[in-house]
Amino acid sequence: MADAPRPKRNPNSNPSSSETVGNNDDLLNQILLYLPIRSPLRFKSVSKHWLSLITHPHFLHLRTTQPNPRPSGLFFYRYSHQIHPEFDFLSLLHYESPSKPPFKALTFVDDPSDLRILQSCNGLLLCRGLHLYIYNPTTSQFATLPQPPRRVLAPLRCYTTFYAYNLAFDPSKSPYYKVVSINFSWGLPDQYELDIFSSETGLWSPSADPFNGDVSFNPGVFWNGALHWISTSGGDSLYFNVDEERLETMPMPPIPDGWEERRLRYFGESRDHLHLIEIYGPRTTQFNVYAMERDYRGWFVQYRVDIDAIRNAFLEMIRSSLDPSDLHYYQFVILGLIREEKDEESFLVLHIPGKVIRYNFRNKSFRELFDVPRALIMSVFLLKVR
């Protein structure tokens, strides 16, 4: 039996809601902006009109100038002797129905060396193998950077060595990124020099005067237009304003009375805030989360943390073979600090042996997120997807 003919639409009738949306570019833009980035990428094949809309500079500008997004997930580096080792992915957006990871291994380029992630910054990854690469795992696009120029320091005629690389990228201000190369020279009073690569020009250029500093460059933390390098000795830290090419000192929180040493547990950025976690003295499950003033006047206590309940629930975080006064008696690593739009929903992500735990600042509640195989090395990267 033949199918009944479909009724024809009266040209004078009102258009359907789908037609209304499809014919209204402004409305369609607003809908696409609220979807995960992979959805618009798939929708490019719907029609030539949608392809033109999604790839138009106006839509890309709207997408990248949205408020500072939260990280979409954590990548755990899996120990391997392979050139392209696999990563484990923990979604921070959907716990019950985990989203598909943007990648499982760094196979975007055929690099014969041991390809590694150096830094994650606002959706881009800085990777190093035989060459330096900038990789966007959302769009699967990448760029190969030229090697920085090798400096000769007259009159000593000695060469610098490349010590570290840092990525600076703020898509809300510019579509271009910069990579800072920190160069080290032995035997000189001012041991470090900087070179900057700009994706706008495609060139490296020397920057700033030589300087000395007892700080950790691996990795730097990009916030407030600057790369931040934390002190390893308790003295002043440093920050480098990338656009102004200006190096400044940054104070550290004072050590509380009665303690003589500090142990850095976390240094990172979330939702346009710079955070620092230090622990003073041994065997502690209580500590503060500091946030930096935007004008760098100093640190203030943003959150107070008490993970005593986590210790009681997961006794495996106690190293019973050590003396209770030992600095490493409690075994935990702070993987990330996630600030939500509603601050009462902000949380810490912790690793204890075999598990990843979420700790809520406001009510001190916690939940287990993920079982971590013991074979995983805890090199962890937070990835933002715009």
Model-derived features: positions:
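N-terminal entry/capping and adjacent linker segments that precede and initiate structured domains
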Residues: 1-386
